[in-house]
Amino acid sequence: MAERVHRKNTRPVKVGNLTIGGNDEIIIQSMTTTKTHDVEATVAEINRLEEAGCQIVRVACPDMRAAEAISEIKKRINIPLVVDIHFNYKFALKAIEGGADKIRINPGNIGKRENVEAVVKAAKEKGIPIRIGVNAGSLERHLLEKYGYPTADAMVESALHHIRILEELDFYDIIVSMKASDVRLAIEAYDKASRAFDYPLHLGITESGTLFAGTVKSAAGIGALLHMGIGNTLRISLSADPVEEVKVARELLKSFGLAANAATLISCPTCGRIEIDLISIANEVEEYISKIKAPIKVAVLGCAVNGPGEAREADIGIAGARGEGLLFMKGEIVRKVPEETMVEELKKEIDKLAEEHYAKQREAQPN
């Protein structure tokens, strides 16, 4: 079997102001749940997603009304916009004309070759990429007849077929996804894809389920791929508010040290020694740091005896005791604080560390 292409060695592809591939960065994506023709609702949801840390957003384009809304949506958002096209190539042309930063299609399902040529020509003129979205649930009939059922080899063959269509038209700004709802199938398909071509891979476990089940399933599948060095961009697909997809994605990337500017929470699993409401405190602190774009490690621990030593790697933290808390930095106790104010004191110190990071970033920027 061919050698696996590591994410940093994939072909770089520009999507708006971002580059996907050719580096170790993983770009977080999500998808709106609104009707795309409802511009107000769609823009509002995209803004919420951006605030949560989404870097690229995708919208459905099931009809011409949605395609015609792209130009107005694009004017009112800050992050790159991907438009999802199925079957009708005219929707793709209208979306590209409206300023889409990328389109997602299967070249094989938008009709005759002239249709594909028209879409590729429009994408070339605007300098935007195309994502080939292979899905185990919608493989071509001849592949299902050949393999008997959806397999990783069938998915890779489908991807290569669609890639070949674009390459024959001298188009190489391609991103590929290999989605399946079965975790093991998805892992195998992405692994084989990473050995078959060097285009960037968009990771996802499709139809993964509700917030709880989908988070576990996506973390299992995407986490395995990230550890293997596979993937340049990802979406956590959940039957939930899409903001939750972004939160899970950020947390997953933090677990692998792949989120450069994100705060991380350490909290103990609780036991009989705890004398503070650690669970609610941990949830409050987690929510507080979710929007902080600085690599700060924060600890919330329930035991003042072992806490500071156990969280020596944390930049800042609190350990609760009866009626008071210990504020510590890098495992060293800084001061005691009353229990009723210890969370606010922790937040103040987090803000100071974040501001120090932001100041360093500003200093490093060229004038």
UniProtKB/Swiss-Prot annotation:
Binds 1 [4Fe-4S] cluster. The keyword RNA-binding does not apply. Disulfide bonds: none annotated. Its EC number is 1.17.7.3. InterPro entries: Dihydropteroate_synth-like_sf (IPR011005), IspG_bac (IPR016425), IspG_bac-typ (IPR004588), NO2/SO3_Rdtase_4Fe4S_sf (IPR045854). It catalyses: (2E)-4-hydroxy-3-methylbut-2-enyl diphosphate + oxidized [flavodoxin] + H2O + 2 H(+) = 2-C-methyl-D-erythritol 2,4-cyclic diphosphate + reduced [flavodoxin]. It holds the Pfam family GcpE. Keywords: 4Fe-4S, Iron, Iron-sulfur, Isoprene biosynthesis, Metal-binding, Oxidoreductase. The keyword Iron applies. Pathway: Isoprenoid biosynthesis; isopentenyl diphosphate biosynthesis via DXP pathway; isopentenyl diphosphate from 1-deoxy-D-xylulose 5-phosphate: step 5/6. [4Fe-4S] cluster binds at C268, C271, C303, E310. GO terms for molecular function: 4 iron, 4 sulfur cluster binding; 4-hydroxy-3-methylbut-2-en-1-yl diphosphate synthase activity (ferredoxin); 4-hydroxy-3-methylbut-2-enyl-diphosphate synthase activity (flavodoxin); iron ion binding. It is an enzyme of class 1 (oxidoreductase). One of its GO terms (biological process) is isopentenyl diphosphate biosynthetic process, methylerythritol 4-phosphate pathway. Converts 2C-methyl-D-erythritol 2,4-cyclodiphosphate (ME-2,4cPP) into 1-hydroxy-2-methyl-2-(E)-butenyl 4-diphosphate. NCBIfam families: ispG_gcpE, PRK00366.1. Belongs to the IspG family. This is 4-hydroxy-3-methylbut-2-en-1-yl diphosphate synthase (flavodoxin).
